[in-house]
Amino acid sequence: MSAAHKNLLAVWAKEPKDLVAVEKALNELTKVLSASSDLNDKQSALASKDLYEISVLLAILKHDFETFDDYINQMHTYYTMAPENSENKHLMTGLHLMFLLAANRLSDFHMLLEQIPQKEQTSNAYISTPVRIEQSLMEGAYNKVVLTEKNIPSPFYTIFIRIMLDTIRREIATSIEKSFKVLTAKDATVMLLFDNDEQMKKFGQERKWHLDGERYVFEIEVAQEKPVNLDTVRVATQTLFYAKQLEQIV
């Protein structure tokens, strides 16, 4: 193993991660691999694997999804050429599926899923997690997406789940603004899938919602350029209903 390869693994293993140091170590290893006359094929293959995998994970931490998209595709090519070094393939594939969901690239999501054996789609946690999330999104069971964050196979999934939740909340909020004259802060917290009142209050302030005591008051425009997304309203209201039913049971 080259010194640059060892250094990359050591820097990556440190907590909390120094992203600048990791990027520097990646660049150093890239230079070594570009002139790898001193490395045998096995050493070069292992170094390339760690280079690609850590580049993928670093891109997630930096929210650099263009770089992520580039490296994750290189990763798939690598695993095809070096299956003996593919112990992290399921993690990488799962992260790719999560990215495609978060980017709303559903056709690409299903194309990638078709390449994965059916058994792995249900039995492997890295793969089954994005599969379940996609089903929940299609069903409008957004509360299940929230619950998924509490039981994920890798912390790197969290960023993609939060991107999806941000998108869901924006859609629900837009529908609320066009469909409700008055909504209690408590009901808004449930409908927007927040854990507590403070999160709801911050979100309301960002949307410039008018809070009158314990309720939000909206001005509904008579003429709307776009029709209300009734399905989003239905799902949000359904979420509120189920939450109230659960409170009664408890």
From Swiss-Prot:
Domain (PCI) ranges: 63-233
GO CC terms, sorted: nucleus; proteasome regulatory particle; proteasome regulatory particle, lid subcomplex
Gene3D superfamilies: 1.25.40.990
InterPro entries noted in UniProt: 26S_Psome_Rpn12 (IPR006746), CSN8_PSD8_EIF3K (IPR033464), PCI_dom (IPR000717)
Keyword Zinc-finger part of the UniProt annotation: no
Transmembrane segments: none
PANTHER family on file: 26S PROTEASOME NON-ATPASE REGULATORY SUBUNIT 8
Family: Belongs to the proteasome subunit S14 family.
Protein task: Acts as a regulatory subunit of the 26S proteasome which is involved in the ATP-dependent degradation of ubiquitinated proteins.
Protein name: 26S proteasome non-ATPase regulatory subunit 8
Protein source organism: Caenorhabditis elegans
Gene this chain is encoded by: rpn-12
